[in-house]
């Protein structure tokens, strides 16, 4: 008996107006993730995935390119307003926010969510260069 052909349903992109941009700026890399209000990821990009390797990965320009790539990916969702959550001490903190602003998003709120220990784990030893 022949199987009936299964038609693939066309995926409809849902229209989302408000989103949250999570920026993880470490000393070595910058990760930009744009989610909806519930935390479901819509798009993400990294400085390393944007073609930068080694020490160039940890530059503000690499973070800017990653933010531009991520912004380009979420344009199809109709995103207009962004709330920005910045985590980490890296060099890509400010340039990422500037790039998202230049991409045409209205930034409603900027929050620093860098985890600060209340005397938790011992930090790594100081570098001797």
Swiss-Prot record:
**A matching Pfam family:** Ribosomal_S11
Lineage runs: Bacteria, Pseudomonadati, Pseudomonadota, Gammaproteobacteria, Pasteurellales
Gene that this sequence comes from: rpsK
Q: How does it assemble?
A: Part of the 30S ribosomal subunit. Interacts with proteins S7 and S18. Binds to IF-3.
Q: Which residues form a coiled coil?
A: none
Q: Which organism is it from?
A: Glaesserella parasuis serovar 5 (strain SH0165)
| Keywords associated with the record | Ribonucleoprotein, Ribosomal protein, RNA-binding, rRNA-binding
Name of the protein described by the UniProt record:
Small ribosomal subunit protein uS11
Molecular function terms, GO-annotated: rRNA binding; structural constituent of ribosome
Reported function = Located on the platform of the 30S subunit, it bridges several disparate RNA helices of the 16S rRNA. Forms part of the Shine-Dalgarno cleft in the 70S ribosome.
């Amino acid at each position: 008996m022949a199987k009936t052909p299964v038609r693939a349903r066309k995926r409809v992109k849902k229209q989302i107006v408000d989103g949250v941009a999570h920026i993880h700026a470490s000393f070595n890399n910058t990760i930009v993730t744009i989610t909806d209000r519930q935390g479901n990821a819509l798009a993400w990009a990294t400085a390393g995935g944007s073609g930068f390797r080694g020490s160039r990965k940890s530059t503000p320009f690499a973070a800017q390119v990653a933010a531009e790539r991520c912004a380009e990916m979420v344009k199809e969702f109709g995103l207009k307003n962004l709330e920005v959550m910045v985590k980490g001490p890296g060099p890509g903190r400010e340039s990422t926010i500037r790039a998202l602003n230049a991409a045409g998003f209205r930034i409603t709120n900027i929050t620093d969510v860098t985890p600060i220990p209340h005397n938790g784990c011992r930090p790594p030893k100081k570098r001797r260069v």
